[in-house]
Amino acid sequence: MEAAAARPVIRVAAICGSLRKASYNGGLLRAAAGVCEESIPGLRVDHVDISGLPLLNTDLETADGGFPPAVEAFRDKVRQADCFLFGSPEYNYSIATPLKNALDWASRGQNCWADKPAAIVSAGGGFGGGRSQYHLRQVGVFLDLHFINKPELAVKAFEQPPKFDSDGNLIDAQIRERIKQVLLSLQAFTLRLQKKD
């Protein structure tokens, strides 16, 4: 009997919309990477740093359609990813500027986001960043991103007991398990869209 073929490794580009060092949204993404290493074979989460991207300005594009080096490097990482995990903080009921800037740069010219699966996690006050998730989904329609619908994860970061330590690392085991469920859903959805399962 032949051994079962190994599942391909799905590369998840984790993009945090907050640039703050101790960002709770960054903490969710770090926890996601750890969960994958510990308990989800075939899924690898790689952090994609957006802090070096210039503000979108089409004057920075070259006549032949090129981009500044930091933008080219970012676009390459987006193209190489099989799917995305966004850590989306909420500012003024919407998406944070750094995340919107990254989305815009990778959509210029050839849309690097097109036809790829994605999931969103968020942490914050009030609704835990839930409103930013809905705005990100709206932007994703134009970008042709395919978001998983369930499960949703919007962490009310300031409610007791504490969910994060002073460095922004997730310390809540229940939320860690919920992240695992998001990742398993993203993995299954990605395999389905790629027709690899």
Curated annotation (Swiss-Prot):
GO terms for cellular component: cytosol. This is Probable NADPH:quinone oxidoreductase 1. The keyword Oxidoreductase applies. Homotetramer. Belongs to the SsuE family. Coiled coil: none annotated. It comes from the Eukaryota. Transmembrane segments: none annotated. Its cofactor is FMN. The lineage of its organism: Eukaryota, Viridiplantae, Streptophyta, Embryophyta, Tracheophyta. Its EC number is 1.6.5.2.
